Structure formats: structure tokens, C-alpha cells
């Protein structure tokens, strides 16, 4: 039950093999069934929007700088090493992270735990900018499907116009929501799927009349 756009971004980033293990905790923390906890209090600065759970590559970079004084270059190298599973590189950087964090007054055992958590999820971690783009598309399409369901389904059918199996599934889904899909009609149909004045979806003429587009234009020039 996302309540903010940030929740959509996190959902997109979490739904992959590594971070997926954290989904139950993320949900419970969001809905108040579990307390929001931070391994080190200052981590709230970058983990507040994700309820104390590291979700994005950018968070790993920012936290490595905050906790252990990594430079921008070192934090980016850490991101690359985790993303590409470069074990030798990670083993080389871990002591620097632990020691840098210790110098800043953080418990080495807690730092070990943080590093282990990062290793578990980071190989599949998504960067936030990509997750944001995908979530924006999801938000737009969800809005269209909720507010213009017939038009949305007609457009989706047109997008899958050469896949009859997918069109059949979409027709069934439309029917379940009260939207009927009707056969072609020379007075109502367009080239592809469309919606008539009654809110029904009409098959496009191009699916049934196996002629060139130019021939269809001569038959009904106003609709193509």
C-alpha cells in the first residue's frame, strides 16, 4: 500500500533477488508493526525515506562517506565493486571502512554488521535514478488504467496487436472489469483497437482486413 512516490521507488528497487529479503521488514516498518531502527543513529540522514533499510546504491555511497570518511571516488569504487561482485576489491576496501568508522567513534562490530548487510544486497542493488524513472512510468500507467480503463486496455491491445495470446488475456481482464471487447465495425472501428461512445473496445480493421494501409485509407480515410 504505497502512500508516497518514494514508496513506489523503493518497491521498484526492492523487487530483485538480493534486496527482496528485506521486503517483509520494509512493509512492517512502514505500517508501524515493527520499529524503525538504525544500526547507527546518524544513518537516519540517508535511510529515513526507506525506514532504516539500505535500498539504493546511492545510499551505500553516501553512508560510506558519512560513517568512514570515504572520498567520492572511493565510494563510487565501492559501488562498482559490489555491483560487479569484485571480491578482491571488496576485501581490500573492508578494512578501510571498519577502521574509518572506528576513528569516527562507531562500534567495529556494528560496522561489520553493516558491511555484511551491504554485501548481501548490493550485487543486485538498483540505483535510485533508474528506480525513479521506472516508478514514474508505473505511476503514469496506473493513473491511466484507473481513470481511463477502456482507453488504456485498447492501447495495450494495440501495442500487442501481433500477439493473439496476449490480446486474449487482455480481453479477459477487460471483461472482468465490465469492459466488453467487440468485433470490427466499419462504422466504428479504426485501424487498431479503439473505444466507442458506449465505452466498449472495438477491434481494429487491420486485424481482419488483410489489405495495405493505403487500401484501408481509401475505404475510410477519416479514421486512419
Where are these regions (language model features)?
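Noncatalytic, beta-rich nucleic-acid-contacting surfaces in large DNA/RNA-processing enzymes
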Residues: 1-224
